[in-house]
């Protein structure tokens, strides 16, 4: 709420808070905070990455659409990365169409995008990350794809939910695709 001042709440996973889970608990209550705010751990991971790569980047570029929400989010991300990691973050602001063209061409480092649920089910978020698209960083993982494929065809609601819980954890905790 402090960043956008519009009643927004921080996200602690890919699937938005309030999405249905098992009928008694929400998806977020069942899966917990898979993306908690932890600047110390972020710094540890960054330092490990720099060590493995042999150098730190001189700068990183954050692609953002030219709208007030995207620019506010980008400014916050820039501030966090500068403060926590000491990164030089350049914000590259484009029209929505221009941002889309760069993403389609895979000509970006990382970007601010958003997705709103089409329906009250975690799958509205999770199936976006199958089969590698430029808008999702070309992420493509056979295990993730199998979990989503099984969840889409599963007739046992408990097994389907378990597949989706595992998929979100894989995407966020294991593969660190979404933060």
Where on the chain are the PLM-derived regions?
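Extracytoplasmic/peripheral linker and loop segments enriched in polar/acidic and small residues
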Residues: 88-99, 124-179
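Ligand/substrate-recognition segments at binding pockets and active sites
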Residues: 47-117
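Second-shell loop/turn segments in exported
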Residues: 26-35, 64-67, 133-137, 148-155
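Solvent-exposed, polar/charged alpha-helical surfaces in well-ordered, non-transmembrane soluble domains
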Residues: 13, 40-48, 72-79, 83, ...
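Structural transition elements
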Residues: 10-48, 69-71
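Bilobed periplasmic-binding protein-like "clamshell/Venus-flytrap" ligand-binding domains
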Residues: 4, 52-69, 114, 155-179
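Periplasmic-binding protein-like
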Residues: 1-21, 38, 73, 168-179
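Solvent-exposed loop/turn segments at secondary-structure junctions
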Residues: 8-10, 19-22, 66-70, 96-98, ...
């Amino acid at each position: 709420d402090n960043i956008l001042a519009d009643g927004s709440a921080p996200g602690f996973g890919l699937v938005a808070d309030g999405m249905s889970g098992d009928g008694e608990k929400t998806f977020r209550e069942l899966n917990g905070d898979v993306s908690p705010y932890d600047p110390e751990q972020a710094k540890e991971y960054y330092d490990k990455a720099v060590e493995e790569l042999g150098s730190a980047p001189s700068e990183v570029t954050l692609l953002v659409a030219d709208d007030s929400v995207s620019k506010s989010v980008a400014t916050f991300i820039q501030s966090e990365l500068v403060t926590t990691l000491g990164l030089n973050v350049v914000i590259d602001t484009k029209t929505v169409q221009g941002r889309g063209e760069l993403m389609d061409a895979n000509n970006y480092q990382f970007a601010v995008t958003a997705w709103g649920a089409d329906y009250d089910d975690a799958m509205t978020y999770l199936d976006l990350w199958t089969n590698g698209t430029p808008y999702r960083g070309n992420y493509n993982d056979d295990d993730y794809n199998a979990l989503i494929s099984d969840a889409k065809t599963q007739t046992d609601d408990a097994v389907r939910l378990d597949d989706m819980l595992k998929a979100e954890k894989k995407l966020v905790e294991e593969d660190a695709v979404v933060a």
